[in-house]
């Protein structure tokens, strides 16, 4: 069995300011591969440190994308992506860089096949005026896009105003669900970002 120090991949990620034509700087949509440790696709925990972000997520990469969310996050906000969900990280302000922490299982990898078959995520952003406009990808069946702020994840041991690093320092077992999502199976069943 692996210890907590072995299972987390802690990343500091920085996106340059700017855009790619009308599109914001963003990651390619992906799903985390099933971990050989847990036999689950693993969640990801984001904490925004600089800039403005949207963590886009959808339940599935099949023709029926399920629920689709654009979670708008500011510095200090935490956003959790559940196991098996498609997700992408988007910088929403072309005038500043986006810097964030991202935690996932160290054995993670990405699944792209179904997303590529659909030519991307179910909704993709473009800059329009001072904000983002979301365009539906017609390679998926229609699913409404819910735009929202991050919630407090009390069911996962995360509240507002305390960094995930401080939470980990004080109580590392809080994040056992990152390498072993089954310990929070009941949360993932009806997950709301």
Predicted segments — roles?
Residues 3-8:
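Short, small-residue-biased leader/transition segments that mark boundaries at the very start
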Residues 12-41:
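Conserved short histidine dyad/triad with adjacent acidic residue
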Residues 15, 39-60:
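Short, conserved beta-strand element in jelly-roll/cupin
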Residues 49, 57-59, 83, 91, ...:
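Short, structured patches in soluble enzyme cores that scaffold and shape functional sites
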Residues 58-68:
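Short, structured beta-strand/loop micro-motifs enriched in basic residues and often containing a Trp
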Residues 63, 92-193:
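Double-stranded beta-helix
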Residues 72-93:
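Conserved metal-binding segment of the jelly-roll/cupin
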């Amino acid at each position: 069995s692996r210890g907590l120090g072995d299972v987390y991949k802690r990343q500091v990620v920085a996106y340059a300011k700017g855009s790619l034509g009308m599109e914001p700087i963003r990651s390619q949509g992906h799903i985390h591969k099933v971990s050989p440790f847990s036999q689950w696709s693993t969640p990801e925990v984001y904490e925004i440190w600089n800039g403005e972000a949207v963590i886009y997520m959808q339940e599935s990469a099949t023709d029926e994308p399920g629920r689709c969310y654009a979670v708008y996050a500011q510095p200090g906000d935490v956003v959790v992506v559940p196991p098996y969900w498609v997700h992408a990280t988007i910088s929403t302000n072309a005038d500043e860089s986006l810097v964030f922490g991202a935690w996932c299982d160290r054995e993670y990898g990405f699944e792209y096949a179904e997303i590529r078959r659909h030519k991307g995520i179910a909704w993709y952003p473009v800059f329009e005026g001072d904000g983002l406009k979301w365009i539906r990808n017609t390679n998926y069946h229609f699913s409404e896009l819910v735009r929202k702020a991050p919630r407090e994840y009390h069911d996962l041991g995360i509240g507002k105003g305390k960094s995930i690093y401080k939470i980990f320092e004080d109580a590392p077992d809080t994040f056992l669900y990152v390498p072993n999502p089954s310990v929070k199976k009941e949360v993932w069943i009806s997950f709301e970002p």
